[in-house]
Amino acid sequence: MKNSIIRTKKVLIFFLFLFQYLFICAQELPEQYREKFSESFPIRKEQHLEVKAYIDQLTREKIDESMSSFNPDFISIADYENSLYPYRQKLGSFFGYPPPKAIKGKVSRFEKAGEDKYCTIYRVWIEVIEGVHAYGIYMVPKNIEGKAPLIIAMHGGGGNPEAICDLDTRVNYHSFGHEAVKKGYLVWAPGLTMLSGYAKDSIISGLDRDLFDKQLKLLGSSIIGLEIHKIIESTRVLISEHPEIDIKNIGMTGLSWGGFFTMYTTALCPFIKAAAPSAYFRDSEADLIKTTNVTEGTQSIYQFKGFGHFQAIGMICPRPCMVQIGENDGLFDMNGARIEAKRASLFYEKLGIKDRFEFNTHTLGHEFEIESIFRFFDQHLR
């Protein structure tokens, strides 16, 4: 009985304290809980940091994936060449090559522009899509007997075929076309869809290269894909119709944007035997990082689905390739170019043909150093 009374007292005391606690809490609760916005700022900051870390991780993974996406077969040179097909398909698809409605090319106009003591010069229009023509200059040396090697010579940004052929003076080409025919090379210089500021071309309202590129990308191609088609198809037509061209010895070179087109056209076009891109070469990894830096306002054209410069060289391999850049080129960083050249050289080294790749530097700026280019072509196209 005594123990029961004690237990009852304890229960009563417990409920008394509980009632007092709840009463006090009820008295102290505000009508509405409030706090300053600044008190929750650490949470918002943490949310942003989490998203940034997530994006950084995905970016690094995408960069690594892109840098390692080209894996040809190194068992033998033949196996290597055979393994390039799917990569060329992917590269062509990235640029939208061939473009919609591409056709087998045909010459529309072939006109003599002039001649001098070394060559005869022709202007050529070749229809490559109905209503769309590849235009270029074809230079035929007068001292050839039988067949001669052909050099596809690509002008740079804001340029024209007349400049690289030296019909008028543009010093950074160093009279390339004229010097080539003096050495017995045929020259085919296709034109890109560009206006030339130094030629004082008039601006044509509504006709803009960048606008064309945006429109073509919506339609399954790009200005680059269209122009690669122009280069390849027009060269095919010349080869088929001009017996003076040695079809086993076709090379390609270009300056600046012409260097870009030299790399990627040769990567896609197996009949080009040797390539010498000049004044357009940079670190692909740095380019991919730039792609993710949307605050710059401009992004790399390569993106994660494309192929960097060293990978384009990998698709040129096992054919000979010389990449040229000037130590005083203000547009392309020499340190980045050296990094990229090392990556490119590994394709040749793994196949035991490292002598077929050359990273050629000179003391000039954003321009051709033609002696080295002719030395390279003399070695591989003769």
Language-model-derived ranges and their functions:
Residues G254-Y264:
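Glycine-rich nucleophile elbow surrounding the catalytic serine of serine-hydrolase chemistry
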Residues E244-S256:
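Alpha/beta-hydrolase fold nucleophile elbow
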